[in-house]
Structure formats: structure tokens, C-alpha cells
């Protein structure tokens, strides 16, 4: 749908209604997400199981990548220490926009069993903005698959032409 406006001296400007284009692009983006794994402890083992033939994230369009520059989202799985938090932030900063984060397991979400340790970060969201939390200790591959489906819903609902605000930043504003 197109509309015409007269901006004054410059002539006519054509405005386009892009909601159908947004839907088409978001459907393509949600169906081909590349992920970066950041497995740190026992949740990392479940993360590997999710990529295996029984759970197979690839059937949902999620493809693992070794480089953060090729990844759309990062899965942080396991206990995040302050020393590893610097590396997680560095990898997150190297990812292209729009970028998303899934926090997998109790240790990533809030520190989990090791939260009283002096070197344990009390949640990934203290270091990088998180979009989807997957609970469990460790979460089953089915739970991570549900987290991926939730992330796909988030990607489908966003307008692709605007700069996105991660969930953690949006809550703080």
C-alpha cells in the first residue's frame, strides 16, 4: 500500500506500508538462526545433547557457528565465573546486530548451586542482556528447544528495520 504526501518545495514523497515485508523478513530470520555455544559446566553437556540426533536443533533452523561474527544468538550454559564473564562479554560484543542471548540452566540464570562461591557471577544478565531464560539443573534438551522456539517468537514479532533493545535494557528503561 502506498500513500502520497506533499513535503512542500521538494516535490512528492512516496511512503510505503511495510508490515507484510516485515512479516516475510522476520519469518526468514526466525527460521534460520545461527547460534554460538558458550558451554561452561554440566549444562554444556546437555547443550551438546540438544545438537545431537535425538533433539536436533537444526530441524528448527538453528545452526551452530564457531565464530561470534556469524552468530545471531549465543547460548550461555553453566556456571559463569567472573574470569569467564569478560570472555562472554567480548564474544557478545563481537556478534552482529541484532543479537540475542539464551541463558541455559540455574547456574547461568542466578548462580545456581554455586551461587555462594566468591568467583561465581550471580547470573549472566549481570554481564550481558538476556532474552530467554531456560530453567533447570541441568535443563533437558526439550527445555532448550522450547527456549529456541520462544526466541523465534521474539524474532518474528520485532520490526526488522528498527534497532532492537535487548530485554534486560528494555526492563531497566
UniProtKB/Swiss-Prot annotation:
Task: Give compartment(s).
Answer: Cell inner membrane
List keywords of the entry alphabetically. 4Fe-4S, Cell inner membrane, Cell membrane, Iron, Iron-sulfur, Membrane, Metal-binding, NAD, Quinone, Translocase, Transport, Ubiquinone
How the cofactor is bound: the record states: Binds 1 [4Fe-4S] cluster.
Question: Which residues of this UniProt protein bind [4Fe-4S] cluster?
Answer: 42-43, 107, 137
| Membrane topology of the entry | Peripheral membrane protein
Q: Note the InterPro entries from the entry.
A: NADH_UbQ_OxRdtase-like_20kDa, NADH_UQ_OxRdtase_20Kd_su
Report the EC number(s), separated by commas if there are several: 7.1.1.-
Role according to the record: NDH-1 shuttles electrons from NADH, via FMN and iron-sulfur (Fe-S) centers, to quinones in the respiratory chain. Couples the redox reaction to proton translocation (for every two electrons transferred, four hydrogen ions are translocated across the cytoplasmic membrane), and thus conserves the redox energy in a proton gradient.
Q: Known HAMAP family for this protein?
A: NDH1_NuoB
Assembly notes: NDH-1 is composed of 14 different subunits. Subunits NuoB, C, D, E, F, and G constitute the peripheral sector of the complex.
Stated name of the protein: NADH-quinone oxidoreductase subunit B 2
Q: Which organism is it from?
A: Anaeromyxobacter dehalogenans (strain 2CP-C)
Amino acid at each position: 500500500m502506498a500513500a502520497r504526501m506533499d513535503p512542500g518545495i521538494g516535490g512528492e514523497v512516496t511512503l510505503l506500508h511495510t508490515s507484510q515485508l516485515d512479516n516475510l523478513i522476520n519469518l526468514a530470520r526466525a527460521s534460520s538462526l545461527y547460534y554460538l555455544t558458550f558451554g561452561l559446566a554440566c549444562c554444556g553437556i546437555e547443550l551438546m545433547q540438544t545438537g545431537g540426533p535425538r533433539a536436533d536443533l537444526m530441524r528448527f533452523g538453528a545452526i551452530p557457528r564457531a565464530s561470534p561474527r556469524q552468530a545471531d544468538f549465543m547460548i550461555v550454559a553453566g556456571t559463569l565465573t567472573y574470569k569467564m564473564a569478560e570472555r562472554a562479554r567480548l564474544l557478545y560484543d563481537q556478534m552482529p546486530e541484532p543479537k540475542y542471548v539464551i541463558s541455559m540452566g540455574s547456574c547461568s540464570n542466578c548462580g545456581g548451586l554455586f551461587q555462594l562461591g566468591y568467583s561465581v557471577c550471580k547470573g549472566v544478565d549481570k554481564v550481558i542482556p538476556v532474552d530467554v531464560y531456560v530453567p533447570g539443573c541441568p535443563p533437558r534438551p526439550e527445555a532448550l528447544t522450547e527456549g529456541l522456539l520462544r526466541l523465534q517468537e521474539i524474532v518474528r514479532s520485532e520490526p526488522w528495520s528498527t534497532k532492537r533493545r535487548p530485554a534486560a535494557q528494555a526492563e531497566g528503561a
